[in-house]
Amino acid sequence: MNREDFIKEPVEDIRVSERDTVADLIEKYCKVHGFTAADVCRAVEVLSEGLRNSDLRFLSFTANLVATGLRGLLAQMVRSGYFDVVVTTCGTLDHDVARSLGHKYYKGYFEADDVVLAKSDIHRLGNVFIPVENYGPPVERLVKDVLRELGKTMVAPYELIWEVGKRLSDENSILRAAWERKVPVIVPGITDGAFGTAIFTYSEELKLQGKDFCLDVLADEKLLSDMVFSSKRSAALVVGGGISKHHVIWWNQFKGGLDYAVYLTTAQEYDGSLSGARPREAITWGKLKPEGRSATVYGDATVLLPIIWAGVLAKVQKA
């Protein structure tokens, strides 16, 4: 590359006013350039293009976000029609069901005395306080009620999740939105939470009655396989890391990799973790195409996701 290739576009100074929209702010981030502003600018650009040009669009996120008010935004995103499949963790099901049933989560703080909280029967999730009775038991009761009502000896996880979503009346429910739009919610670690524990104990109860029950997890994988192999282009918005991130990029490697990938994360790559791995590492595994477009934004999703999604909506609805 020549010297001129490095000095094409100058940084611009900006001003803001109370009349600025989020779209205006994104444009100003693009002018600011340094440092995370440039990443937000690119994320909006890449995600907007990916949603427009792809016929298979993944939304992946971790459960902790569902314990916050971001749950409503995630439900809105599922209901928007811009995503074809959700990949997440069992905690998402737990928090969404619990809150949809009217059980409150409360504003707390990180520095709370955890011993006192434990004695008071209060769970702490970061700076969110959850009364013990508001979390596990109501989730397990509903899941078992749905299983009994269905009366099936075998069910796919995504089908069961839809059945639960069908019975929730909360407009802020992710599972309700997924059922309405028929967006499959894939939870590869479905036994890792109250929702999955309820399935296990239901199965054990049936065994005592001499009956069998099978959770057909491979049906979810078959569904993903069919979606990936029937697609022409794929895009993913990945919020957080862990199994929900890996399951998206894992399946896309079998079709040559994602065409578009946007990561929102707080994890770093120096420890070699999957959560911290950047899109460029995914290229070496065939999980992102070498010519694919990608962006990584470091920061708290409760701050970044509303800004990025508002910027994306402004772009895709304008196009």
UniProtKB/Swiss-Prot annotation:
Cofactor: NAD(+)
InterPro entries: Deoxyhypus_synthase_arc, Deoxyhypusine_synthase, Deoxyhypusine_synthase_sf, DHS-like_NAD/FAD-binding_dom
Known pathway: Protein modification; eIF5A hypusination
EC numbers: 2.5.1.46
UniProt-listed Gene3D superfamilies: Deoxyhypusine synthase
Reactions catalysed according to its record: [eIF5A protein]-L-lysine + spermidine = [eIF5A protein]-deoxyhypusine + propane-1,3-diamine
Active site (catalytic residues): K287 (nucleophile)
Keyword tRNA processing belongs to the record: no
Disulphide bonds in the chain: none
EC class: transferase
GO CC annotation: cytoplasm
Pfam (any one): DS
The entry's keywords: Hypusine biosynthesis, NAD, Transferase
Record GO terms (molecular function): deoxyhypusine synthase activity
NCBIfam families, per database record: PRK01221.1 (NF002294)
PANTHER family for the chain: DEOXYHYPUSINE SYNTHASE
Job of this protein: Catalyzes the NAD-dependent oxidative cleavage of spermidine and the subsequent transfer of the butylamine moiety of spermidine to the epsilon-amino group of a specific lysine residue of the eIF-5A precursor protein to form the intermediate deoxyhypusine residue.
Family: Belongs to the deoxyhypusine synthase family.
Protein name as it appears in the record: Probable deoxyhypusine synthase
Taxonomic lineage of the native organism: Archaea, Thermoproteota, Thermoprotei, Desulfurococcales, Desulfurococcaceae
